[in-house]
């Protein structure tokens, strides 16, 4: 993202990063042969943390550039917090997993709405 990129492009980048995080998290959950035991120091969890930090930095730049778009930023922050909390503990419980999934669903609905509000024909 730079100061000249159109808003729809910045939204698409944020959406891509958040979708990547979501799919990486799902893959991590599916690969767990230990049930609900988690290792926050594993290579995959460290990679998830790096991706979370990257998205948080990107979201901060987005917030500075589009300070009026608070709902999307709040939803991204909530999703990143829920993701970090889920994968930084040694045990994963159903309540935390459901909270993470719900915040992800809310975030991706926000992306759909933001995309509708910023179609390619209006933001060039």
Curated annotation (Swiss-Prot):
Broad class of where this protein is predominantly found: cytoplasm
One MF term in the entry's GO annotations: DNA binding
InterPro entries referenced in this protein's UniProt entry, alphabetically: Biofilm_formation_reg_YbaJ
Stated induction or repression of this protein's expression: Expression is autoregulated. Induced during biofilm formation.
Record bears the keyword DNA-binding: yes
Annotated family: Belongs to the TomB family.
Disruption phenotype: Deletion of hha and tomB, in the presence of a conjugative plasmid (R1drd19), decreases biofilm formation, cell aggregation and increases motility via flagella and motility gene expression.
GO biological process, one term: single-species biofilm formation
Domain of life assignment: Bacteria
Organism: Escherichia coli (strain K12)
NCBIfam families in the record: PRK10667.1
Coiled-coil annotated residue ranges, if any: none
Keywords, sorted A to Z: Cytoplasm, DNA-binding
Cellular component GO terms held in the UniProt record: cytoplasm
Note: Hha and TomB may form a type II toxin-antitoxin (TA) system.
Annotated compartments: Cytoplasm
Record function comment: Attenuates Hha toxicity and regulates biofilm formation. Binds to various coding and intergenic regions of genomic DNA.
Protein name: Hha toxicity modulator TomB
């Amino acid at each position: 993202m730079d100061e000249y990129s159109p808003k729809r492009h910045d939204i698409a980048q944020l959406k891509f990063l958040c979708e990547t995080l979501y799919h990486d998290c799902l893959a991590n959950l599916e690969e767990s042969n230990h049930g609900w035991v988690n290792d926050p120091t594993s290579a995959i969890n460290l990679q998830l943390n790096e991706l979370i930090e990257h998205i948080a930095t990107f979201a901060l730049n987005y917030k500075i550039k589009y300070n009026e778009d608070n709902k999307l930023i709040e939803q991204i922050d909530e999703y990143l917090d829920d993701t970090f909390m889920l994968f930084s503990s040694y045990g994963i419980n159903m309540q935390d997993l459901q909270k993470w999934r719900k915040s992800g669903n809310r975030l991706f609905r926000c992306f759909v709405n933001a995309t509708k509000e910023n179609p390619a024909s209006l933001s060039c």
